[in-house]
Each structure stands twice: as structure tokens, then as C-alpha cells.
């Protein structure tokens, strides 16, 4: 025991803690040197007991009133326990004792940052910059403040300075990617990370963020290459596998994506998001039983995963089990009632079940949420047309054109409805507009009303634009 604890050497942290706790039990007063007090404070911090650590700082300040370090420690502990006024008092005392100590201004800046007193935070961080030997974390906090102020350009500047001081600061690398994303400056992001990689080729975080930037620019092959480098450097990098899977999905490489998504399970527990992503891949491959199995795994892990509930509905819809699919579409809608895709699926399923009034209401909701959904305008008007509500169908398409004046599909559909309504002159005006917009799509007019093939006037006009 004596060999383990080296009794008699007060600098041994365990010995100091034992003496301190003995003093408390005996309600006595023992003397400890400054280093011993620091060791005792750190012991309680590591034990996640800030209250006892604070008690030690009181004894330390009492025995070593001119040691600023204990007032600084005390301030940190007051911040950790949300006692901000007391933290400010401790910092003022420390500043009186040691005004050139950078930690005083860094901690005060942290408190002001949490209080959203942005300028006060910046003033203290700037003061700390002039005093600190290592500045990358201070520069990072200044960047955070500018983000809170919505000034992402300035945040980028400070994040770059942070990385100049410490190229391995992972937080700065990720925050910089976030800022470039908010600013929609993906090309600048790519340029930065490529230059960074030239100097730090083994930075998995840089390769990962480069992959994300390529992804956002729809450069999916390049993003996959970047994720592969990130994985090569850090083979347990689950997020890189997941995002690589997403890129493969964008390239319609669903079977590969499934395998990559499943690789994440080797390095982190399965999540509802990953199960849902795998389910979507199986759905795209029309392997509906497997898709449904993974969607069910997703909602079991995360009942709030609305896309997975929706996915179950899609698999049932595919199997023409429309009534069952409606139940799951509504489960998704309960979680996200502003999702136009969910409303569209409900409208379509209700149409297939001949629930036409309900389908019409659902389509109205789709168009309220997403007035640029061309297919929804076409389908809604088609339901009305099938019920001989020709005027209403024309009215719906007219509203669709107002919201989507460049959509040739809507103009061609209007031609069909106007001919059906025997409004021939107006129909020909819309036909000219449709052909001017996109003559190659004229076939959709005949697909909807095949009998128009026999109309020589229409055929002649179309031939003028397509020959």
C-alpha cells in the first residue's frame, strides 16, 4: 500500500485527496500547497462532481488568496453549474490578480456567448487573442459568435484563421463546411478542401467534407471518390459510408448503396435513418418484401420516422393493397402534415379506391403545399374530367398554368379539355403556346385524347412545328 500511494509526498494526487477528505470528515483545517489543491479540484471534476470541486476552490482561495488560478477554476465551475453572476465575480477577482491571463477573457467570452451578448463576447475573445499562446480554440469561438449573428462570411474568415493556427482542428473543418453550405458557396468549399488536402492528405475530415461539397453540386462520382479516401484513412468512419450510400442512390446504383449502408452497422448501432435508406433502395429495386422489412425496422427503432411509415405504404400500394397503404400514409401524415408527397400518395390511393371526393380534397392540399407539382395539377383535373366536371377541370388547369407558366404539359392538357368542351378557337391558341414551349411533347395530347389524331387542323399545326 505504501508503495502504491507514496505516503509523505503531498504532490501525489491520491494522497492529497485523501488528506482533504479526512480534513472534511474531521471538520479540521489542513494546509495544502497550490499544486495539491489543483490536483484535488481536477479529481472532483473528473468524477463529475462540480459541487465538491467548487467547495475545494473556496478552501484554495482562502489559503492562497493571491493565486489567480483558483478564481479562474472557480469561475469555470460556476459556469458549469449555471451560476453566471458568481462566475463574473470570480473572473473579476482573477483579473485583478493576473490581468494578463488569457483564460479570464476566454471564459468571460464563453459566458457572454451563451447569453447571446455577441459584442461583449467578441470583445473578450479579441482580448484573449492578444494574450494566449494557443489561439485556435479562441478563433473557433469567435467564428461561432459570428454564426449566431448570422454573419457567415466573417465566420468563414475566422475558421480559416483557426485552421492556419491548427490544421488538425476537426471542429473548424466541419464548421467551415457548414458555413459554405449556408452561403451556397460549394465551389469555394471544394477549392478550399482541395488545397487543404494538398497539405494534409491524410485528413479524413477534409476528404469527407470535400465529398459532401461534391454531393451538393451533384458531382456524385467525385463525391464517392472523396468518401472512399476518407474511409481508406479512417475505416470505421460510419458517416462517410452513409453519405457514400446516398451518392450511390443518386446514381441509381441501389444494390451497391444497400451494401454500403449495411457497412455502417459494423461501426455504429443501426439507426432509423439507415434502415429507412436501405428500405428505399429495396423499394427502387421493386423488392417490396425486403423494403417493407427495413421500413418496419426503421419505425421500430424510431417511431417518428415519417418517411419509413410512408415507405411501408408505398410497398403496399405497389401490391395494389390500396386500403392498407392508406393507413400507413396517414401515419406518415400524422408526423408531417405539411409534406406534399404524403398528401399526393393519399390522393392517388383514394382515387384508386374510387373515393373521389376525398381524393379531390387531398389533391387540393397537395397544390396548396406545392403549387409547382405539375403531375398533381394534371391528376386533379383528370379526376374532374372523368366525372364530366369539364368546367372545373379547365379551371384547375388554368390555375396550374398561372403557377407554372412554362409547363408545356399543362398547355397540352388544356388543349384537350377545350376541344372536349368544343371551345376550338381557344384550344388552338393554347396548342400554339404549347408547341412554342416544347414541340417534342405534343404526343401527350394524343395519349390523353387519342381521337384528336383524326383532327386535321391539329395535326397540320403540329406538323408545322415538328417537321
Indicate where each model-derived feature is located.
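Canonical tetratricopeptide repeat
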Residues: 73, 107, 141, 175, ...
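Canonical positions in the second alpha-helix
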Residues: 60, 93-95, 127-128, 161-162, ...
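Structural marker of alpha-solenoid helical repeat scaffolds
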Residues: 63, 96-98, 131-132, 165, ...
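Start-of-helix register in tetratricopeptide repeats
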Residues: 35, 69, 103, 137, ...
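Register position in tetratricopeptide repeats
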Residues: 46, 80, 114, 148, ...
Amino acid at each position: 500500500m505504501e508503495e502504491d500511494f507514496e505516503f509523505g509526498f503531498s504532490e501525489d494526487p491520491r494522497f492529497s485527496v485523501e488528506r482533504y477528505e479526512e480534513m472534511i470528515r474531521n471538520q479540521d483545517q489542513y494546509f495544502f500547497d497550490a499544486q495539491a489543491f489543483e490536483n484535488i479540484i481536477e479529481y472532483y471534476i473528473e468524477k463529475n462532481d462540480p459541487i465538491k470541486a467548487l467547495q475545494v476552490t473556496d478552501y484554495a482561495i482562502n489559503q492562497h488568496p493571491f493565486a489567480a488560478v483558483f478564481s479562474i477554476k472557480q469561475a469555470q465551475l460556476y459556469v458549469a453549474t449555471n451560476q453566471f453572476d458568481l462566475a463574473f465575480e470570480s473572473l473579476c477577482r482573477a483579473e485583478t490578480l493576473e490581468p494578463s491571463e488569457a483564460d479570464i477573457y476566454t471564459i468571460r467570452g464563453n459566458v457572454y456567448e451563451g447569453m447571446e451578448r455577441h459584442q461583449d463576447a467578441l470583445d473578450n475573445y479579441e482580448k484573449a487573442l492578444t494574450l494566449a499562446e494557443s489561439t485556435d480554440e479562441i478563433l473557433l469561438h469567435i467564428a461561432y459568435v459570428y454564426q449566431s449573428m448570422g454573419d457567415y462570411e466573417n465566420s468563414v474568415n475566422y475558421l480559416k484563421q483557426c485552421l492556419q493556427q491548427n490544421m488538425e482542428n476537426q471542429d473548424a473543418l466541419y464548421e467551415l463546411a457548414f458555413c459554405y453550405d449556408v452561403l451556397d458557396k460549394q465551389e469555394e468549399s471544394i477549392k478550399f478542401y482541395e488545397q487543404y488536402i494538398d497539405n494534409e492528405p491524410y485528413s479524413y475530415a477534409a476528404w469527407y467534407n470535400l465529398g459532401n461539397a461534391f454531393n451538393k453540386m451533384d458531382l456524385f462520382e467525385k463525391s464517392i471518390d472523396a468518401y472512399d479516401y476518407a474511409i481508406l484513412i479512417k475505416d470505421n468512419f460510419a458517416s462517410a459510408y452513409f453519405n457514400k450510400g446516398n451518392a450511390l442512390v443518386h446514381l441509381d446504383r441501389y444494390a451497391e448503396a444497400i451494401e454500403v449502408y449495411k457497412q455502417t452497422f459494423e461501426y455504429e448501432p443501426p439507426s432509423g435513418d439507415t434502415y429507412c435508406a436501405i428500405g428505399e433502395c429495396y423499394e427502387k429495386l421493386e423488392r417490396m418484401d425486403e423494403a417493407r422489412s427495413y421500413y418496419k425496422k426503421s419505425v421500430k427503432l424510431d417511431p417518428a420516422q415519417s418517411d419509413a411509415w410512408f415507405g411501408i405504404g408505398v410497398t403496399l400500394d405497389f401490391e395494389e393493397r390500396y386500403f392498407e397503404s392508406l393507413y400507413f400514409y396517414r401515419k406518415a401524415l400524422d408526423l408531417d402534415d405539411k409534406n406534399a408527397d404524403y398528401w399526393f400518395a393519399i390522393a392517388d390511393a383514394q382515387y384508386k379506391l374510387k373515393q373521389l371526393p376525398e381524393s379531390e380534397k387531398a389533391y387540393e392540399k397537395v397544390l396548396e403545399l406545392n403549387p409547382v407539382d405539375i403531375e398533381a395539377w394534371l391528376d386533379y383535373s383528370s379526376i374532374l374530367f372523368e366525372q364530366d366536371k369539364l368546367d372545373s377541370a379547365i379551371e384547375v388547369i388554368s390555375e396550374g398554368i398561372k403557377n407554372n407558366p412554362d409547363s408545356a404539359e399543362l398547355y397540352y392538357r388544356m388543349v384537350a379539355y377545350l376541344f372536349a368542351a368544343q371551345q376550338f378557337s381557344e384550344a388552338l391558341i393554347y396548342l400554339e403556346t404549347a408547341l412554342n414551349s416544347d414541340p417534342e411533347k405534343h404526343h401527350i395530347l394524343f395519349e390523353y385524347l387519342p381521337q384528336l389524331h383524326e383532327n386535321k387542323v391539329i395535326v397540320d399545326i403540329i406538323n408545322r412545328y415538328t417537321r
